[in-house]
Curated annotation (Swiss-Prot):
Keyword field: Carbohydrate metabolism, Glucose metabolism, NADP, Oxidoreductase
Binding site for substrate: 183, 187, 221, 240, 345, 350
Annotated organism of origin: Thermotoga maritima (strain ATCC 43589 / DSM 3109 / JCM 10099 / NBRC 100826 / MSB8)
Gene Ontology CC, one term: cytosol
Function: Catalyzes the oxidation of glucose 6-phosphate to 6-phosphogluconolactone.
Signal peptide stretch: none
GO biological process, one term: pentose-phosphate shunt, oxidative branch
Protein name: Glucose-6-phosphate 1-dehydrogenase
InterPro entries tied to this protein: G6P_DH, G6P_DH_AS, G6P_DH_C, G6P_DH_NAD-bd, NAD(P)-bd_dom_sf
Active site annotation, chain numbering: 245 (proton acceptor)
């Protein structure tokens, strides 16, 4: 089958398959002196430039409180010199309307140079700066269409703050101008979940409670909080991972097929699925959610400190670095099927996978092989690293007698296509510039996820002794209580 470019085989650089941006544009990055800009945004734009996707006329304007000139700004990045010629910098006080008037003058000069008012404002700043920036963009008229605004997680700290942020956003920008970015939705392997489900009838027919026993989603990191202690102390892992990445992956695995893959149809089904998740019973929360915090331990052969010993972390901090939970989706497709989710820092390895575990056979016809000893069929989506899909099934062992053995049939992107997968930010920045909202979150996306998790957060805050996190040694798969969460149901976490 040929792609949109008429190619039967992907080029070595899959970015060359992406649509070229024809219209000139400008992108203004607030927080341009920060880590996200250096690690992700500028490298992604540079890759789009080198792949020939960006138009001849465009500009990248960095804006931050740090004082520096264009030359110093450009020197921060390892990028194509021709790309860097399109980059400039202005120092901005986010709280000062006069500073935004100077910003507007600079933008107007750049707009004349490219002959286009197609503008993107990217807020790569802490969440407490969102509202003053949005207000000052409005005061200077920079919020008018066709301008678009991109905001990063966390989208608020709870339901109330998320609604305040959304009220401000929608006071100054219309919904089709707002792009709430969750970079996990930009990953090629995450999007492949949809193709696997909805382009293969054989799998979609068994994707329900008649055949599926349970689903496991694991997002593990071997690193600690690193230089993000200040941020993490105010957020914690439930807000940082579950409110966005984890629930979005869950939605892709469990949602109903949209009538077409366009922005609204796709997002409607995603939200519908999230609304079907059963609320957690706060009075028996310990039976549904396990909270953990890493202690001292050994990761990858190296001794590492406990979370409370990390620079910038309070010595008596109760912030969680690990969460495991069980939840149910109350709809026809998934009624009765438990979903087990876990994520944590300082675990043995970095891996993100989704495992759809099917029911065991009802009866074994093989002598000496009880049905409960036969491992069930499992479909595994490995989202990172070594991205791919595996199907685990039983085969006959090559020996006398009928002895089944579990094997895995593996597809790996790199092995089959032999191409470099685009970074999530490359895809998502392209979509923002083109105005395609499909892979971005809507307001109701955010609110329904906060409605689910808000009671949990409030319970933790109201009774810190009862819900104090269990300490687990760094380099292990979390506290023992996380194992008990799934073992009480007669199941076990997959060995990763």
């Amino acid at each position: 089958m040929k792609c949109s470019l008429g190619l039967e085989k992907c080029p070595d650089d899959t970015l060359r398959c992406f649509p070229k941006i024809e219209q000139p544009f400008g992108i203004v990055i607030f927080g341009a002196s920060g880590d996200l800009t250096k690690r992700k945004l500028i490298p992604a734009l540079n890759r789009l430039f080198e792949a020939g996707i960006l138009p001849e006329r465009f500009f990248v304007l960095g804006a931050a409180r740090t004082k520096m000139d264009d030359k110093k700004f450009r020197s921060r990045f390892d990028a194509n010199p021709d790309f860097l010629e399109h980059c400039s910098y202005i120092s901005v006080d986010y709280q000062d309307p006069e500073s935004f008037k100077q910003l507007k003058n600079t933008i107007e000069t750049l707009i004349k140079r490219i002959d286009s008012s197609n503008l993107v404002f990217y807020l790569a700043v802490p969440p407490d700066l969102y509202i003053p920036i949005l207000e000052n963009l409005s005061k200077t008229g920079l919020n008018e269409k066709p301008a678009r605004v991109v905001i990063e997680k966390p989208f608020g700290k709870d339901l109330e703050s998320a609604r305040r942020l959304e009220d401000t956003l929608q006071k100054y920008f219309q919904e089709d101008q707002i792009f709430r970015i969750d970079h996990y939705l930009g990953k090629e392997t995450v999007q492949n979940i949809l193709v696997f489900r909805f382009a293969n009838f054989i799998f979609e027919e068994i994707w329900n409670n008649k055949f599926v026993d349970h689903v496991q989603i694991t997002m593990a990191e071997d690193i600690g909080v690193e230089h993000r202690a200040g941020y993490f102390e105010n957020v914690g892992l439930l807000r940082d991972i579950f409110q966005n990445h984890m629930l979005q992956i869950l939605a892709l695995i469990a949602m109903e097929p949209p009538s077409s893959f366009n922005g609204e149809n796709f997002r409607n089904e995603r939200v519908k699925l999230l609304r079907s998740i059963r609320p957690f019973p706060v009075e028996e929360l310990e039976s549904w959610i396990v909270r953990g915090q890493y202690g001292r331990g050994v990761v990858n052969g190296k001794e590492v400190p406990a979370y409370r010993e990390e620079p910038g972390v309070a010595k008596d901090s109760n912030v969680e670095t690990f969460v495991a939970m069980k939840l149910f989706i109350d709809n026809w497709r998934w009624s009765g099927v438990p979903f087990y989710l876990r994520s944590g820092k300082r675990l043995p390895k970095k891996i993100t996978e989704v495992a759809v575990v099917f029911k065991k056979i009802p009866h074994s016809i093989f002598a000496g092989v009880p049905s409960d000893e036969l491992e069930p069929n499992t479909i595994v989506f490995t989202l990172q690293p070594n991205e791919g899909i595996s199907l685990e099934f039983q085969v006959k062992r090559p020996c006398p007698g009928m002895f089944p053995q579990l094997l895995s049939m593996d597809f790996r992107y790199e092995d089959y296509f032999g191409v470099k997968l685009p970074d999530a930010y490359e895809r998502l920045l392209l979509d923002v510039i083109l105005g395609d909202p499909t892979l971005f979150m809507r307001r109701d996306d955010l609110e329904v996820s906060w409605e689910l998790l808000d009671p949990v957060l409030k319970a933790w805050e109201n009774d810190p002794v009862r819900f104090s996190p269990y300490v687990y040694p760094a380099g292990t798969w979390g506290p023992r209580e996380a194992d008990l969460l799934i073992e009480r149901d007669g199941r076990k976490w997959r060995k990763l």
